[in-house]
Amino acid sequence: MGDIAAQTAEADLFGRVEARGIEAIPAAERHGAPRDLAFLWAGAFVNYASLFTASLLTTYYGLGVWDGLVATALGTAAAALILGLLSNTGPRSGLPQIVFTRGIFGFRGSYLGAGLTLFLATGWFAVDCIIAAQAGAQLFGGGNRWLTFGLVLVIAAISVGVAVFGHQTIKVLEAYGAVAFAVLSAALFLSLAPQFNWAQGAVVTGSNYAGAFVLGFMTCFALVASWYPFASDYSRYLPAASSTRSVTLWPVVGIAVPMILLGLFGLLLPTIDAKLAADQGVLAVISAHAPTWVAIPFFLFIVVGEIWANYLDVYTAGLVTLAMGIKLQRWQTALGCGLLGTGLATYAVLVSDFHIAYEDFLILTYLWAPAWAAVVLLSFFVFEHKARPALALGAWLAGTASSLLFVNYANLFGNLVAKPTFFNDPLIAGLHGADFSGLVSVGVAAAVYWSGRQWGRA
């Protein structure tokens, strides 16, 4: 028994390189409780990205504070429930999320999901670097793209340099980081509260209001959905007998609570100075209107927090490259993810407006992750006895292809082309700008897969 305990300790310790790769975690090394997932996912969402995402609803979409909060809460809760359900594949199998899907899409079919997940991990690496760089730039007056670019390079280099640890290190850092960021956010919120316009309403009306509300819902849904392929990467160390209900609900709590609280903060910040928020972002609002004693620690913690948050991305990128059969060492994976992410971050800082690039990234997530999740969940909870990889892959692709009709391409690519026109403009105009692509993706993929399985039984 002592040897087993020693093996468990060696395999997954804070501050040490994780021993396990993409193989199933043995029963002797399983540890923790489902409630641990609440703290881990809270750590992933108690950050500036959550605040910034919600701020888009009042800064650019035209929603008010309280209806924006409803859209934030609904979009977050709906997406978090799916992530919680996906987390159950970890305790059951002991496998990383993409490796688990080999039993659904087939060995080669899983490569597509692996490649797309690598894109997600790299994209989030870029987002985290930009957020940290923009926060750091505020300490020097902000607003200078070249200063931000220089900080992106420094932060990316540091992020890659420290990306050598594993699951338990991430879990501990995310938990303590969440508490520290929450305390600083609360202090900042209280210092700015007298300047908020708590009663600010929507500036869009009629059918355009409905379109804006759906867009806000989908933006918050997309933020959470972008983590779907990561789900069991952080639950696979739990004992196999873990309660399905607990494994599902604790991630929902960990995601929804910080998103709603920080979402309210993000929705209120543009009410202090709408023009500054639209031109330079809500970090500039904080810099201009918050007391120095709380603003400086807040910005510093964003920088540090985003650097260690980058390891979530590099960790999953490492698992994915192994799942694709690419024989790279951990440092090589970190370097590759860092170089690609730095390139994306450079584009977003020097070529594009970051808020537009960020929206583009979230919407691109929609083009595959929801349909993928629908097929995985049906396979796991309903049709687990016999794999149908061709049907699973076909249903995923059908859901993704159907969603293309409902993408608001003008919102996605409008910054690249003057007065762009797209094949579905009449439909999107009829929907008043609402982007239903994510919901269509889930619905079509689920319907095709369910129907195919039922037909196969007949």
Placement of each model-derived feature along the sequence:
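Juxtamembrane transmembrane-helix boundary signature
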Residues: 71-105, 114-120, 126
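Hydrophobic, membrane-embedded alpha-helices of multi-pass small-molecule transporters
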Residues: 34-51, 189-195, 204-269, 292-311, ...
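Membrane-interface "cap" regions at the ends of multi-pass membrane proteins
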Residues: 1-67, 212-217, 236-246, 456
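Transmembrane alpha-helical segments of multi-pass small-molecule transport proteins
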Residues: 114-118, 141-165, 179-190, 220-231, ...
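Hydrophobic, small-residue-rich membrane helices and short re-entrant helix-turn-helix hairpins
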Residues: 30-34, 165-178, 229-261, 276-285, ...
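Membrane-water interface regions at transmembrane-helix termini and the short interhelical loops
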Residues: 59-63, 88, 104, 112, ...
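C-terminal membrane-solvent junction of multi-pass transporters and transport-like membrane proteins
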Residues: 372-451
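Transmembrane helix-loop boundary segments of multi-pass membrane transporters
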Residues: 58-70, 138-150, 168-177, 283-292, ...
